[in-house]
From Swiss-Prot:
Record-stated family: Belongs to the cation transport ATPase (P-type) (TC 3.A.3) family. Type IA subfamily.
Name of protein: Potassium-transporting ATPase ATP-binding subunit
Compartments it resides in: Cell inner membrane
Catalytic residues in the record: D307
Signal peptide: none
Organism (species): Salmonella dublin (strain CT_02021853)
NCBIfam families reported in the protein's UniProt record: ATPase_P-type, kdpB
TM regions (residue ranges): 34-54, 58-78, 219-239, 254-274, 588-608, 616-636, 662-682
One of the record's GO molecular function terms: ATP hydrolysis activity
Amino acid sequence: MSRKQLALFEPVLLVQALTDAVKKLSPRAQWRNPVMFVVWAGSVLTTLLTLAMVTGQIAGSALFTGIISLWLWFTVLFANFAEALAEGRSKAQANSLKGVKKTAFARRLRAPRHDAQADNVPAAELRKGDIVLVKAGDIIPCDGEVIEGGASVDESAITGESAPVIRESGGDFASVTGGTRILSDWLVIACSVNPGETFLDRMIAMVEGAQRRKTPNEIALTILLIALTIVFLLATATLWPFSAWGGNAVSVTVLVALLVCLIPTTIGGLLSAIGVAGMSRMLGANVIATSGRAVEAAGDVDVLLLDKTGTITLGNRQASDFIPARGVDERTLADAAQLASLADETPEGRSIVILAKQRFNLRERDVQSLHATFVPFTAQSRMSGINIDNRMIRKGSVDAIRRHVESNGGHFPADVEQNVENVARLGATPLVVVEGARVLGVIALKDIVKGGIKERFAQLRKMGIKTVMITGDNRLTAAAIAAEAGVDDFLAEATPEAKLALIRQYQAEGRLVAMTGDGTNDAPALAQADVAVAMNSGTQAAKEAGNMVDLDSNPTKLIEVVHIGKQMLMTRGSLTTFSIANDVAKYFAIIPAAFAATYPQLNALNVMGLHSPNSAILSAVIFNALIIIFLIPLALKGVSYKPLSASAMLRRNLWIYGLGGLLVPFIGIKVIDVLLTLLGLA
């Protein structure tokens, strides 16, 4: 669920952006954008020339120079406005997060126990390692890990999702976020950060742009724009002696106008706004990016590692069948499977208990009265079970159970091997049940591939993105589901080490890899991946390792993250193409106007039939300023995104923004020229 979206032109934001745009007229602010700094310098110079003409210190048309100066200032203001509006939208989102931060007191425990003596201290005084007790109705004062207790927590202030979540000690759901509220029960929490370092603090800093640094692509584009600006500056500077030698020197005002119209002011003025808006759109999808670099990397990703459960399949695998080994009856298998699953709170574990009830009326036994030892599932052992009355019952993956049987001196039956293959070929997940060294049979867990996911993978393939399914299932099951879902490759029987090795393998081939994760065991792979989306419901280690956090904790969001990243890169590229193509029309407007008096042959370039030299120059300068305003919505919303191959996308954007960049100025400059003529300003 996403938080409330801001309107593109919120009235309050517009007023603030206008104020900020004026504040950004200072030289210190303009220096950060070299292209617009040149325009700013031209504005200052023409303003001084206007004043000198008005006071009679130099000859020239004060009205013409004054109008040129005014529109040059408008050009700078419009660029400032675009950046200020993008920043204002981000700050508004940050302010909504700041409302979550409340000055509160915390119960700091003197020992890591629920019943330990507590001191009431301001939440701001809590440090990493402090232990706090939080009760129903309290605001959780810090980020941390639950070390005792379990509670229902309202995280809507952070995630926008109204449904409460369960947070409890142990496992992957022990991480809590400061600023969320406990609805029931209590938690003992070990603070994991110092003041100012909480997840909420980092979210606010990121969204406000306080930590926004230029991304590598942004830096490369800025260098290109600076190079173009220097080239045009040198070219313009040589035109004055060139025209003077011809006997009719071009005025400084006209040369400044020519320079401003030729340098890439459109993309120069919108570049910063595009970057800020990209991070803002990511937040609109309920994803917090640690930097613009992370958003940009998402646009360059060409390998997606996707968890099978919850991303490709619905994630609610249910036990569908008991397939006993030769010499074992189905009821015996069901009874052992149910015992091994009594303490398993996963949907799969509960479904095994329920299936045994339905098939054989095996009632669920009281866990406490059994006096048994339960063995939890781990990523390393890949099995779980129970030790009860000298019985050692385990259920788990085929390889894990085979190793267990062989280590206990047993033999894995060939008929069970065949049953495992049959279940896997049908796309179900086989779990093998064993008692001691005796294999009892197979449980079939059936999962359902999400509707429409195959089409989404086909779209990603068109874009040149390889999809890899990550699953703990055996190779046969993984292959069946991979074929049904339409992924390009899969990693079966995945362990944290295998994921990390796979990421490094792709990166060694020069590819950019994106993945999701929520557990502490995912942290190494998340830290290695180029785009690492950690689930907000995951552990603190996972969130710290990733460079994005999905507040909805939805693994499928990774595909949307890639789309937003690509849209940002496409927007930047499209507007750069449009900006550079603009120069051609401005060239046809200003060159004849500036030099036709010296070289009448240049009148042939006046293909637009502009009214007069002054009108041509004014029209080009006015268009140059107005086009920034007209493109602000596109910079903030992003260009229309379609899943196409790189070559098809390039062709499409060249047609739309390249050809559009050529035609729009011809039309716009001519319309402005007609209006100026009608108003008597030509």
